[in-house]
């Protein structure tokens, strides 16, 4: 297991470029219940900073109202929590500064979408070549 040595309360996100919510259960529910994390995500949204969530975690964004009118994707069965979103079922969706990923099988495509948002298409191509990724 991965053990955290800090929690969201003990971190300074002032210079953070992006907040990324990992997927899985019960982790996504735990994230959704954390007031400090919800406030951080809302602050990033207000400041128009990038937000990414994969698997079950897009539900956090949905419950905060951040997906209304946006294309989004999530792990099958969690669509009901993406309030007001157009749930596409695609492996990855980027709508503005928000990236959502469907699940574990979309992890590489999701990661490359995050890199593209932060570093651009040239960096994505460089990484794909270095990792021998040819089918994305």
Give the ranges of each region predicted by the language model.
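Extended, subdomain-level signal for the structured scaffold at the beginning of enzyme domains
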Residues: 1-47, 59-63, 68-69, 81-89, ...
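Short, thiol/selenol-centered motifs that function as redox-active sites or metal-ligating centers
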Residues: 54-55
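Long, charge-patterned amphipathic alpha-helical coiled-coil/hairpin "stalk" segments used as oligomerization
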Residues: 76-78
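Beta-strand-turn-beta hairpins that frame and shape the catalytic cleft
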Residues: 93-98
């Amino acid at each position: 297991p991965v053990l955290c040595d800090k929690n969201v309360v003990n971190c300074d996100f002032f210079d953070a470029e992006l907040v990324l919510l990992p997927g899985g259960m019960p982790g996504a529910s735990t994230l959704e219940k954390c007031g400090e994390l919800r406030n951080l995500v809302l602050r990033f949204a207000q400041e128009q900073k990038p937000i990414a969530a994969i698997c079950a975690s897009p539900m956090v964004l949905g419950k905060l109202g951040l997906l209304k009118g946006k294309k989004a994707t999530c792990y099958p069965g969690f669509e009901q929590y993406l309030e007001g979103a157009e749930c596409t079922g695609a492996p990855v969706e980027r709508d503005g500064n928000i990236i959502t990923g469907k699940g574990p099988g979309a992890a590489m495509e999701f990661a490359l979408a995050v890199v593209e948002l932060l570093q651009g298409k040239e960096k994505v191509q460089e990484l794909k070549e270095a990792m021998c990724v040819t089918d994305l």
